[in-house]
Amino acid sequence: MTTPMKIDKVSIVIPVYNEQESLPELMRRTVAACEQLDAAYEILLVDDGSSDDSAAVLTAAAEAPGSHIVAVLLNRNYGQHSAIMAGFSHVTGDLVVTLDADLQNPPEEIPRLVEVAAQDYDVVGTVRQNRQDSWFRKRASRMINALIQRTTGKAMGDYGCMLRAYRRHIIDAMLHCHERSTFIPILANTFARKTIEIPVMHSEREFGDSKYSLMKLVNLMYDLVTCLTTTPLRMLSVIGSMIALLGFAFSLLLITLRLFLGSHWAAEGVFMLFAVLFIFIGAQFIGMGLLGEYIGRIYNDVRARPRYFVQCVVSQNPLSSQQETQ
């Protein structure tokens, strides 16, 4: 049994997009929560190309004497997950906690995530209790969660909640993945050996409106499916095989009916044409599926994701262990 790695410093990464109204309260509550920790801390707020005064507010907070805040300013809007990855590239902590800027997930939950992560967990996920979102957002979130679980095989209760904690080696592994479209919770689970989910509170949004419109949710769904799995490509072969088998069975049925009950049961060969058409359509889908397999392999190679991830090497030779983990 391995000894849990000590957490000497905690980094908080918060993506910000047009949240100038909530920023003062967000920073106050986050600092207050981090002061309860037994470890050092830093708070990285990543401005994702905001069109309001969010960048100015963050800059002023970061320049204040004795501030624990680090402002990372992006030149334009790249999206929530890209902004978080930008924050990851600047963290210095042993444990990294991500948090949304809308205060719907209370920063007061941070000490609990750190406490759970200290029990030798690589990733600590969260499940929102008594969600305060609209009916549409709840239904959309459930559909996306179900779709992700079916297509990726990663069973988690709430993919949409960004209040999560990651060990430093998980962050380093994700930074070695250079694909442009990614979904951090699933990517982290790809490298995690030990994960857990805990329930957290969920509050109503006090400032502004949600930045996820209907079209952004639809785009997110497509990004999730296409950037994390090649299952849709393989489904072409499955559907094609089913159509071809259906057409073949239909043709056998028509031949049997014609032989035993007369030609009128086969509609003078018209139904047989449909059966043959089904077989050809199925064959086309199978061909597209095979082509998709090759495209999927090219896609996986282009992403340049590590073939494997070694969390640690236990050896009596410290030098050997160091070389293996580089």
Swiss-Prot record:
Keywords: Antibiotic resistance, Cell inner membrane, Cell membrane, Glycosyltransferase, Lipid A biosynthesis, Lipid biosynthesis, Lipid metabolism, Lipopolysaccharide biosynthesis, Membrane, Transferase, Transmembrane, Transmembrane helix. It comes from Sodalis glossinidius (strain morsitans). It is found in: Cell inner membrane. The chain crosses the membrane at residues 235-255, 270-290. Pathway: Glycolipid biosynthesis; 4-amino-4-deoxy-alpha-L-arabinose undecaprenyl phosphate biosynthesis; 4-amino-4-deoxy-alpha-L-arabinose undecaprenyl phosphate from UDP-4-deoxy-4-formamido-beta-L-arabinose and undecaprenyl phosphate: step 1/2; Bacterial outer membrane biogenesis; lipopolysaccharide biosynthesis. CDD domains: DPM1_like_bac. Pfam families: Glycos_transf_2 (PF00535). Catalyzes the transfer of 4-deoxy-4-formamido-L-arabinose from UDP to undecaprenyl phosphate. The modified arabinose is attached to lipid A and is required for resistance to polymyxin and cationic antimicrobial peptides. Belongs to the glycosyltransferase 2 family. Its main location: membrane. InterPro entries: ArnC_tfrase, Glyco_trans_2-like, Glycosyltransferase_2, Nucleotide-diphossugar_trans. It catalyses: UDP-4-deoxy-4-formamido-beta-L-arabinose + di-trans,octa-cis-undecaprenyl phosphate = 4-deoxy-4-formamido-alpha-L-arabinopyranosyl di-trans,octa-cis-undecaprenyl phosphate + UDP. This is Undecaprenyl-phosphate 4-deoxy-4-formamido-L-arabinose transferase. HAMAP family: ArnC_transfer. GO terms for biological process: 4-amino-4-deoxy-alpha-L-arabinopyranosyl undecaprenyl phosphate biosynthetic process; lipid A biosynthetic process; lipopolysaccharide biosynthetic process; response to antibiotic. One of its GO terms (cellular component) is plasma membrane. Its EC number is 2.4.2.53. It is a multi-pass membrane protein.
